[in-house]
Amino acid sequence: KIDYVAIETYNLYNGEPMTLIMAESRINAYLKADQECKEGDLLPFDKEKKQCPWRIVDRMKGTELEGMRYEQLMPWVKPCEKVDDFAPKFVTEYAAAHPEKVFASEDGRDKFVEMESEAFRVILGDYVTTEDGTGIVHIAPTFGADDAKVAKDANIPALYLINKKGETRPMVDLQGKFYLIDELDNNFVNACVDKEAYAHHAGDY
């Protein structure tokens, strides 16, 4: 069991106020003990003097964070899953309950379901430690077998692209470059891609 804290502090890059969550035992790895505000209001941020005050505003267990939703960091593409005989039960059930989110690939061979509402939430895991990091682990289902299993067990859909051949692909190609819109399946783009936002990054490394 890991004890977590909510900390009120500032963004070191722009000085904007923010609240972060981390394992209590990892505070000293990221924040200076002499800048903690134990009483009263949070002191102002001072970039020149490298003063970044902070204070603990709440304490919680990991179980209290389970199910909490968060905003997608780069919301250009919505998660989706393939709907076929090999799809996990949570995918087929979601597709049956939300037929308006089901779409076919351009060639009509495969069906997929957009699943944004089921992603971006906190799950629990016995693999999380406080030896390093913040005590919070980011899971990406398309980046390795371990992440894929954890996500599948927790009913978390994957985030990938679908090309003109109807093939699922990671967010970048083998050169680490974002795919061009024209290289992607039109039906997938219409269902899952914010074309205006994605266009700023298409073709970039």
Residue map of PLM features:
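Non-cofactor substrate-recognition interfaces
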Residues: 1-205
